[in-house]
């Protein structure tokens, strides 16, 4: 089980990122638009730098919904390999059957 503080920090980052996503995308579009004057693009860069760092999508870490484990994460199921194995053995994951040949 991951530390509660790490899980909570990641959740805070997730909320911040969703809240600032539209404004961040608008500013990035201005910065990358080569037809605009350099001064306007520079002002957009400064505004982007003033925004909270944890509001960036890149700062979010994929974590297991069950255990909070950050590694060996399956995006489709939103859980780690260990949690997947445990829940799969209990028959809690629909469509997952133990392999036998």
Curated annotation (Swiss-Prot):
Please provide the record's keywords in A-Z order. Answer: Ribonucleoprotein, Ribosomal protein, RNA-binding, rRNA-binding
Which residue positions does the secretion signal occupy?
Answer: none
Q: Where is this region: Disordered?
A: 1-20
What molecular function terms (GO) are annotated for this protein?
A: rRNA binding; structural constituent of ribosome
Keyword RNA-binding listed? The answer is yes
Which Pfam families does the record match to this protein? Ribosomal_S14 (PF00253)
GO CC aspect terms: cytoplasm; small ribosomal subunit
Check the record and name the SUPFAM superfamilies matching this protein: Glucocorticoid receptor-like (DNA-binding domain)
Give the compositionally biased regions (Basic and acidic residues): 1-11
* InterPro entries tied to this protein: Ribosomal_uS14 (IPR001209), Ribosomal_uS14_bac/plastid (IPR023036), Ribosomal_uS14_CS (IPR018271)
Would the keyword Ribosomal protein be found if you checked this record's keyword annotation? yes
Gene Ontology biological process terms from the UniProt entry: translation
Q: What does this protein do?
A: Binds 16S rRNA, required for the assembly of 30S particles and may also be responsible for determining the conformation of the 16S rRNA at the A site.
Subunit (UniProt): Part of the 30S ribosomal subunit. Contacts proteins S3 and S10.
Belongs to which family?
Belongs to the universal ribosomal protein uS14 family.
This protein's name: Small ribosomal subunit protein uS14
């Amino acid at each position: 089980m991951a530390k509660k503080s790490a899980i909570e920090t990641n959740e805070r980052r997730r909320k911040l990122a969703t809240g600032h996503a539209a404004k961040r995308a608008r500013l990035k579009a201005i910065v990358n638009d080569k037809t605009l004057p350099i001064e306007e693009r520079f002002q957009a860069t400064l505004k982007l730098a003033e925004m909270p760092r944890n509001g960036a999508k890149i700062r979010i870490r994929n974590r297991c919904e069950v255990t909070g484990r950050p590694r060996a994460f399956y995006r489709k199921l939103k859980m780690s390999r260990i949690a997947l194995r445990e829940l799969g053995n209990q028959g809690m994951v629909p469509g997952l059957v133990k392999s036998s040949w």
